[in-house]
């Protein structure tokens, strides 16, 4: 078997082999593409404020917050211009290198079948 060299990219994950023989992995390019794809197209008024936390402490998600009909989900998707399930799926793939987001992403992913207005607000907060 021939040595083909060191890997630099694998499935949108950048692999850096440092001089001390350690390996670093990151998905900076993929994360940037997620943020530009979903946040820049969001039609809801988003402030320029950046948050230090992934979810606000006062955001409590319950069964009462879910959408009760498909029409409500479609209206929220049009209002926020974010496809909730696709964005959650992209963020779940990002968790392979950003484990600090896992609690917030999985909390929002629980409601991917019937997201309500509060869930969309939480998703926008996470993307900020």
Language-model segment annotations:
Residues 1-128:
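Long, low-complexity, charge-biased intrinsically disordered regions
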């Amino acid at each position: 078997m021939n040595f083909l060299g060191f890997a630099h990219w694998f499935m949108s994950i950048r692999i850096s082999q440092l001089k001390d023989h350690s390996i670093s992995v990151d998905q900076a390019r993929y994360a940037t593409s997620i943020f530009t794809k979903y946040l820049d197209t969001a039609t809801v008024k988003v402030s320029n404020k950046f948050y230090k936390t992934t979810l606000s402490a006062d955001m409590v998600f319950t069964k009462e917050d879910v959408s009760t009909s498909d029409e409500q989900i479609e209206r929220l998707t049009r209002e926020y211009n974010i496809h909730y399930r696709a964005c959650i799926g992209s963020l779940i793939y990002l968790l392979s290198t950003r484990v600090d987001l896992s609690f917030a992403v999985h909390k929002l992913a629980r409601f991917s079948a019937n997201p309500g207005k509060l869930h969309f607000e939480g998703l926008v907060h996470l993307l900020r």
